[in-house]
Amino acid sequence: MIVDGMTMFFYLWEDIDDNVWDLRYFVLRLHDTVARIKLVRAWQDKSDYADLIAGKNELLEKIRSNAHYRLLGEDQQEKLVTGEQIFVGGMRRAAMQTGAWREETFIATYNYLSAHSHSAPISFFRFSSHSIDYRSPSHAQFASACFAIEIATACLRRVTLRYLDYHLEKFPQSKNEFADSFVQKLRDKDGTRYLFT
């Protein structure tokens, strides 16, 4: 989902202490390793993916010995070593740290869009009242699609602005009238969006 992508972009781009960065990296690798174990264990003997289990254990050692990890509360530490979390501090916190979202807007947007991808009740309880029809889409169907496209556009614009800011800061010689005009137009559009303000 594009909201996840934008959050991850800002999360990985953030200028942070080496210990925090190392912990984030180990947690991402642990999540990947645990996901792979869940995938292969249905079809393989444990001995066939022993390397993944060994890798998981090595990552757990690295996480537990990380200086930033030891500063976290016990509840957060327990969550991180499950391999179920992608973001240190959780996704909501990561999204808030991007500075791109108001918390209520993020929660509402993420909840609504993920409900459809997970076939949660919000995605089908109102089928009849919203006149859901795949031959002749209803207003509710168009509104949902428009909302998703607007969110995707806003997220891509926000990431583009962040990258352009970085690029123009690092390579000031690349500034020109076109770039200035383009960036300003993006900023104007971004500033008028209710999504992030």
Model-derived features with residue positions:
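Long, hydrophobic, well-ordered secondary-structure blocks that form the structural core
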Residues: 1-39
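Secondary-shell segments that build the walls of catalytic and ion/ligand-binding clefts
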Residues: 29-147, 157-197
